[in-house]
């Protein structure tokens, strides 16, 4: 049987999360393939995944390529007409339910129009009563480079059960047509971590495609298990990559200048003061490092 769908996820020192995800997927379905890209994890995790899940295709990277680089490795070996990128810290709620049916709803959305190139499921958090994390995005502000995830933090009463276009995909779970990737290009690797899915969304849109939110499929997200909510790594890349995103995507010089001014002179200063007050000089240092590296290292 031909491979219709390639599910791609990245493992980086997250064996338990990756195994939880594998256990929630219909691995016995021969019309799909599951690809795990191991980004140079410690403790030989790639081999452990291969031994536990022989039906899964495991790619060993000899270095950490980041989110985009790891997924691009997966793209290069994927056989499916559709590629489903999901974080390893996500799970489908209950394998006894029709997980493949939910996944197929994303494929059906992509097949409903030649213009749709990318689709995301409803994303809910795994904690408490599983509040909504994502039901689409609002547009990014040209100046602040911020937007809102629709429904984030709300209890799910079915109020976001209608499919609709969204300007950006959520990196935790996004399915893409292969032809859209061939036209738009693979994920931008200059970001390494954070903002690459927003940049890629714009690349997909510039190639002539639209992006949709499809709530007939729901995935549950543990959120930032790989980097931590308040880690210097996360702070550094968020600081640097907001500026990099502006450089790559700002529509004009005026907007770019105003964004730089806002992000460096207001956001970075405020964040640094906040971190120092809360006795987190490591995070304040990460902010400064992110700005310094953005200014002193050109990236396309």
Where would I find each of the regions flagged by the language model?
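Short aromatic/hydrophobic "clamp" motif used to bind/position activated sugar donors
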Residues: 83
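Non-catalytic, C-terminal membrane-associated alpha-helical segments of glycosyltransferases
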Residues: 233-241, 252-300
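Acidic/His-rich active-site region of diverse nucleotide-sugar glycosyltransferases
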Residues: 97-185, 190
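Short, acidic, metal-binding catalytic loop of nucleotide-sugar glycosyltransferases
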Residues: 23-32
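Glycine-rich, basic loop-to-helix element that forms the pyrophosphate-binding segment
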Residues: 60-78, 88-96
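Catalytic donor-sugar/metal-binding loop of nucleotide-sugar-dependent glycosyltransferases
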Residues: 180-192, 198-220
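A conserved acidic beta->alpha catalytic loop
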Residues: 15, 24, 38-47, 63
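Short beta-strand/loop segment that forms part of the nucleotide-sugar
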Residues: 31-40, 59-61
């Amino acid at each position: 049987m031909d491979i219709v769908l390639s599910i791609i996820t990245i493992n980086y020192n997250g064996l338990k999360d990756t195994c939880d995800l594998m256990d929630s997927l219909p691995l016995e379905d021969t019309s799909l393939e599951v690809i795990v890209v191991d980004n140079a994890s410690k403790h030989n995790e790639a081999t452990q995944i291969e031994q536990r899940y022989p039906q899964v295709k495991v790619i060993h990277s000899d270095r950490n390529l980041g989110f985009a680089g790891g997924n691009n490795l997966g793209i290069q070996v994927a056989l499916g007409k559709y590629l489903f990128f999901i974080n390893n810290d996500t799970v489908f709620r209950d394998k006894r339910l029709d997980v493949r049916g939910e996944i197929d709803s994303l494929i059906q959305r992509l097949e409903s129009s030649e213009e749709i190139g990318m689709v995301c499921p409803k994303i809910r958090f795994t904690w408490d009563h599983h509040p909504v994390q994502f039901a689409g995005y609002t547009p990014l502000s040209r100046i602040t480079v911020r937007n809102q995830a629709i429904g984030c933090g709300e209890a799910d009463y079915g109020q976001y059960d209608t499919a609709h276009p969204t300007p950006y995909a959520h990196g935790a779970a996004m399915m893409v047509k292969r032809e859209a990737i061939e036209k738009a290009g693979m994920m931008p690797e200059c970001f390494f971590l954070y903002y690459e899915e927003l940049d890629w969304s714009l690349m997909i849109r510039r190639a002539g495609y639209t992006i949709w939110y499809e709530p007939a499929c729901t995935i549950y997200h543990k959120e930032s298990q790989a980097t931590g909510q308040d880690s210097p790594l996360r702070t550094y890349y968020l600081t640097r990559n907001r500026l990099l995103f502006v450089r790559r995507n700002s529509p004009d010089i005026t907007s770019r200048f105003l964004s730089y001014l806002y992000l460096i002179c207001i956001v970075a200063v405020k964040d640094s003061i906040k971190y120092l007050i809360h006795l987190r000089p490591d995070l304040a240092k990460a902010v400064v490092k992110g700005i310094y590296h953005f200014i002193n290292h050109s990236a396309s």
